[in-house]
Regions:
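Alpha-helical repeat scaffolds
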Residues: 66-69, 97-109, 135-146, 172-194, ...
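Flexible, glycine-rich surface segments
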Residues: 296, 300-303, 309, 313, ...
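Structural motif corresponding to the intra-repeat A-B loop/turn of tetratricopeptide repeats
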Residues: 57, 94, 132, 166-167, ...
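Residue at a conserved register position within TPR or TPR-like alpha-solenoid repeats
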Residues: 54, 87, 91, 122, ...
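N-terminal leader/linker segments that initiate helical-solenoid repeat arrays
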Residues: 2-106, 110-120, 124, 131, ...
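C-terminal soluble interaction/assembly domains
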Residues: 341-424
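Long, contiguous interaction/recruitment modules in multidomain scaffold/adaptor proteins
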Residues: 3-7, 16-38, 253-257, 270-327
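Generic helix N-cap/helix-start motif at coil->alpha-helix transitions
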Residues: 40-49, 77-85, 114-124, 133, ...
C-alpha cells in the first residue's frame, strides 16, 4: 500500500525547484563559474553541446542520442557529473522519469553533487528506487537524504515502505521479515514525529499501517501503534482495535476487569458486532449487574445488531431480578453508611452504575474509598467510569490516574486515552 503523503517525492524537479546549474559550454570561463569546478573531457563537452542544442529545439530524441554519445566518452567523475546535470535538465523538459532517475544516479554516484542539492536528489532517487521495487537502493538513498539534512517527514515514509517491501506480506512474524518490519516501523515513527515537529498533521493512515504491520509481525509495540491510531482518529472502531489487542495480551484478566474494558466500548460506540454486545452482557451477568445486562442487549437490538435470540438467555435471567434488586438499594445505602468497611458501599455503587444512576454511584464509590477494606484500584477505576459517563471528565481522569498497579492500571490507561479525545 502506498502512503498518502503531503508532498509526493515523485514530482519532477521542475515542480520542486527547477533545473540544476549546467553551463552551455560556450566558453571555459562560464564552465568554471557554475556548479562544482569540473575538468570535463573535450569529447564529452562536444556531445553535451549537441544535447543542449537539441533539447532547446524540443528534439528530445536527438538530445538523448547525444547524451548516450557523451556517456560512451565519459572518462572521469567530472564527466559523469556534468553529463548527469545536462541529462537531468533534459529529463525535465522531456518529462521523462526514467531519464531523471538515471541522471540523479549518475550525479550522486560521481560524488560531486553540491551539498545543498544532495538531500533532495537522494530523496527523489529513493522514491524512484521504491517505485522500481529496488528496496535496498531506496533505503540507501533515503538514509543518505536524511543524513544530508533533507526533510525527514518526506523521506522517512519512503524508507519505511522500502523496509516493508523487503518484509513482504507473508510469514512476516519470522526473521528476517520481522526485523525488516521493525525497522520500517522505526522509520514510520520518525516520519510521524518529524511531521508533528513541523506543525503538520500526520495522516491517520500511517498509524493504521503501523498497527497492521506490527500485528502481522507479532511485535509487542502493536498496542502503542493502536493507541496512536486511536488518538489520531478517535473512532469507536479504532478504540475497539485497541481494546481487543489489550484483551488478547491479557487473557487472564478477571471478569470484573473485563467488564470495565467492555464498558469503554459501550461508552465510545465501539460495540460493533453481535459478539461485542453478548460478551458485554455476559460479563455484566457474571458480576450480578442485572440492569447493565438489560441495557446492553436492548442497545444491540435497537441497532439491529442483535436478533431476538442473541443473548436471550442472559436477558431472560436478568430482567426478572431487576425490580427486586432496585428495591433493595435504598436499604443497602443505609447499611453502607453504618458498615465498618466499604464493601457494601462498593456493591451498592456497582448496582447504581449498572442502572445508569451515576450521581448515586459516585457517592457510594466515594463512601467505599472513605471506609476502606476494598480493592482501591477497582473502586478508582469504576469511580472514573461513573464520572466519565456523568460528564465529569476532569474528575474521571483524576480517578483513573489514582489506579496504581497491574492490569487495572492498563484498563485505566485505556479510559484515559479515551478521555484525551474529549479534551481531558
Amino acid at each position: 500500500m502506498r502512503f498518502v503523503t503531503p508532498v509526493s517525492l515523485a514530482l519532477a524537479l521542475a515542480l520542486t525547484g527547477g533545473a540544476v546549474s549546467a553551463p552551455a559550454f560556450a566558453a571555459k570561463k562560464e564552465e568554471k563559474k557554475a556548479g562544482p569546478k569540473l575538468n570535463v573531457s573535450p569529447d564529452v563537452i562536444k556531445a553535451l553541446q549537441a544535447a543542449q542544442k537539441a533539447a532547446e529545439a524540443q528534439d528530445f530524441a536527438g538530445a538523448k542520442a547525444a547524451l548516450a554519445e557523451a556517456d560512451s566518452k565519459a572518462q572521469s567523475n567530472d564527466d559523469k557529473y556534468q553529463i548527469g546535470a545536462i541529462k537531468l535538465n533534459t529529463s525535465i523538459g522531456a518529462k521523462d522519469a526514467a531519464l531523471q532517475g538515471e541522471a540523479l544516479t549518475q550525479m550522486l554516484d560521481s560524488g560531486l553533487t553540491p551539498p545543498e542539492q544532495a538531500g533532495q536528489f537522494n530523496a527523489i532517487a529513493a522514491d524512484q528506487a521504491l517505485q522500481a521495487k529496488n528496496y535496498d537502493l531506496a533505503i540507501q538513498r533515503g538514509q543518505a537524504a536524511v543524513a544530508a539534512g533533507y526533510k525527514a517527514e518526506a523521506v522517512q515514509p519512503t524508507i519505511a515502505q522500502a523496509y516493508f517491501g523487503k518484509a513482504g506480506t507473508t510469514n512476516t512474524s519470522a526473521e528476517p521479515a520481522r526485523g525488516f518490519t521493525q525497522q520500517g516501523l522505526t522509520a514510520l515513527k520518525a516520519a510521524a514525529d518529524a511531521m508533528k515537529a513541523a506543525g503538520q498533521q500526520v495522516p491517520a493512515q500511517w498509524y493504521q499501517i503501523g498497527v497492521g504491520r506490527a500485528e502481522g509481525a507479532k511485535l509487542p509495540d502493536v498496542t502503542e501503534w493502536a493507541k496512536m491510531a486511536y488518538q489520531a482518529e478517535p473512532s469507536g472502531q479504532n478504540l475497539r482495535t485497541l481494546v481487543r489487542l489489550f484483551q488478547r495480551a491479557n487473557p487472564n484478566i478477571s471478569n470484573r476487569e473485563n467488564l470495565d474494558v467492555l464498558r469503554l466500548l459501550g461508552a465510545s460506540d465501539g460495540l460493533v458486532v453481535a459478539g461485542d454486545f453478548t460478551e458485554y452482557a455476559e460479563m455484566a451477568s457474571k458480576t450480578g449487574i442485572y440492569g447493565e445486562v438489560k441495557s446492553v442487549i436492548d442497545k444491540g437490538r435497537a441497532k439491529g445488531v442483535l436478533n431476538a435470540s442473541a443473548g436471550a438467555d442472559l436477558y431472560s435471567t436478568a430482567v426478572p431480578k431487576i425490580a427486586g434488586d432496585k428495591g433493595s438499594l435504598g436499604s443497602a445505602e443505609a447499611d453502607a453508611q453504618k458498615a465498618a468497611n466499604g464493601k457494601i458501599a462498593a456493591a451498592t455503587a456497582d448496582a447504581y452504575l449498572g442502572y445508569g444512576d451515576y450521581a448515586k454511584a459516585i457517592s457510594m464509590f466515594d463512601l467505599a474509598k472513605q471506609k476502606g477494606g476494598v480493592d482501591a484500584d477497582e473502586i478508582n477505576t469504576r469511580l472514573g467510569i461513573a464520572k466519565t459517563l456523568a460528564g465529569d471528565t476532569a474528575g474521571a481522569k483524576a480517578a483513573f490516574e489514582a489506579v496504581q498497579a497491574g492490569s487495572r492500571k492498563q484498563v485505566a490507561g485505556l479510559w484515559i486515552a479515551y478521555l484525551g479525545t474529549k479534551g481531558a
